[in-house]
Amino acid sequence: MDRRIFGIETEFGITFSSKDSRPLSPEEVARYLFRRVVSWGRSSNVFLANGSRLYLDVGSHPEYATAECDEIGQLIAHDRAGELILNELVAEAEKRLNLEGFAGSVYLFKNNTDSAGNSYGSHENYLIGRRGEFARLAEILIPFLVTRQLIAGAGKVHQNAGQANYSFSQRAEHIWEGISSATTRSRPIINTRDEPHADAELYRRLHVIVGDSNMSETTTMLKVGTIDLILRMVEDGVIMRDLRMENPIRSIREISQDLTGMAPVKLANGRVTNALEIQREYFEKVSEYLLTAGAHHALVPRIMDLWQRTLNAIEQQDFSSIETEIDWAIKKKLLDAYQAKNSLTLNSPRLAQIDLAYHDIATDRGLYYLLQKRGAVARVNEDGQAMAAIEAPPATTRAALRGKFVKAAQSAGRDYTVDWVHLKLNDQAHQTVLCKDPFRNTDERVDALIASLGTESDFSD
């Protein structure tokens, strides 16, 4: 599949800090955050004019799901737009809280764990063809996903019985199954619930829920880009060697805690290998594939270069070549410098605070964004691309239709209902358009539906 639909769903941690007022629970803060959303959308679950979905998930975690994207740079812009939209809601919530006697700051964190040990996720979505055996595809992908934390982990200082260690992944400790139809109870690597949000006869949605939330644009590029390349390779019939693990859930935890990448991993066939070797095998296979298939978009050479450099850095235990591009390495450099400067042990609360502050999405306060302003992290996009994505849906996918309809219905003051595939006017006729093709960005039926918004006789008052 040369052209693929991508999407990222991100759950955010939320808290309120104040020296003068009583503490507020995450549920209370989330209600303030979404008050404006509820006022115009009459719900805390809405689709926006940029084609995205914004809602309160289980546990009062704000969640932003990007619109359907068909380019990785476009996906990164829309993922970042979600942070900017939420920052606007934070500013309004803080004003409202202050008026009601709660002077303080609302914090949103793009991370995966809170201080109580709860986990919330970053879910990736990849459109794949219906043909082919999904179980076999999952078998091929799981060893890659278990070891992908080497190249895409967000990094975390883990505390255990007074001891602290730095790990590749925040999410690894909270994964309990290889594949499952659940997302919260058992937290699998791949979710198998068959909800394609497209023509079910043609497509299926690969729903990956094992990954960390990433601040770095280049890490997101690598995370999504490598999966896309492996999918493309498998779709073209390339055979992978059997890398199924004896116990992927045990392995994902052991790999996370070993920054050398050399922790032993026992495969189902009895062979013993390690995460670095497994990642190398996928890298070499994709490299070989690209010699004949060629790059299908402009970022492929950059993805392959960063993939190789990250594996080399881990093998050589010299992270200086990736400390502006890979989240766990960027954060580790910050922590190491602060720890050395202040003669701290790794279990210091001050280091835990830095670990958390890295994921603060406030652009004037979060450590990642302060690094970005100093030019200390690599970029994929310019700031203007994320700013534009706040209002404008991806122009090349079905999201363009949804965004145009939502904007028109809101401007006309009409009642409507939208999901990933349906556009519906809640009038007497209940006019509905079903958009089953996620690649289709023009549709005469949608144009007619929008045109009807201006025809008073079509609506009951």
Swiss-Prot record:
It holds the Pfam family Pup_ligase. Pathway: Protein degradation; proteasomal Pup-dependent pathway; Protein modification; protein pupylation. Its EC number is 6.3.1.19. HAMAP family: Pup_ligase. The active site is at 57 (proton acceptor). It catalyses: ATP + [prokaryotic ubiquitin-like protein]-L-glutamate + [protein]-L-lysine = ADP + phosphate + N(6)-([prokaryotic ubiquitin-like protein]-gamma-L-glutamyl)-[protein]-L-lysine. ATP binds at residues 53, 66, 420. PANTHER family: PUP DEAMIDASE/DEPUPYLASE, PUP--PROTEIN LIGASE. Keywords: ATP-binding, Ligase, Magnesium, Metal-binding, Nucleotide-binding, Ubl conjugation pathway. One of its GO terms (molecular function) is ligase activity, forming carbon-nitrogen bonds. It comes from Renibacterium salmoninarum (strain ATCC 33209 / DSM 20767 / JCM 11484 / NBRC 15589 / NCIMB 2235). This is Pup--protein ligase. Belongs to the Pup ligase/Pup deamidase family. Pup-conjugating enzyme subfamily.
